[in-house]
Amino acid sequence: MDHLRELFGSLGFSNVETFIASGNVIFTSETEDARTLEKGIEDHLRESLGYEVATFVRSASELADISRHRPFDPSDLDAEGNSLYIAFLPAPPSAEAEQKLMVYRTEVDDFAVHRREVFWLCRKKMSESSFSGALLEKAMGMPATMRNVTTIKKLAAKYPASE
């Protein structure tokens, strides 16, 4: 993670930190446009690492909104063995992509789309589900990265939006 922090620092970002070893990087930038930031980071990582790295930028206020969003019944979220995952996308999915995703709904897996995120309620262990990140990317027609809602809540709490 030290190398990742250095790469982001070399882009001119300040207050660069990593959060758990899964590629979450927190930074301050004068540029506010997420797509501009994503493109610049992706280009720099490709040049520095020699391979493509899909990048998904969210502001602190967006992260707070995502952490508070409740697309499913609370009883489903509290049930033993159920987990909620949030997939980050580079853009809002099309209606056609949403329809493709909903084909994967089962008694185990349910989905809700909210802006540039897909919420996945898994009513078993992720490893026991027939759904996967690869199927999500195929349905959406774009790259995605997934985090457990607990990670998102921790990020939002540790890095609150400034008022």
PLM segments and residue spans:
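Surface-exposed, charge/polar-rich loops and edge strands
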Residues: M1-E163
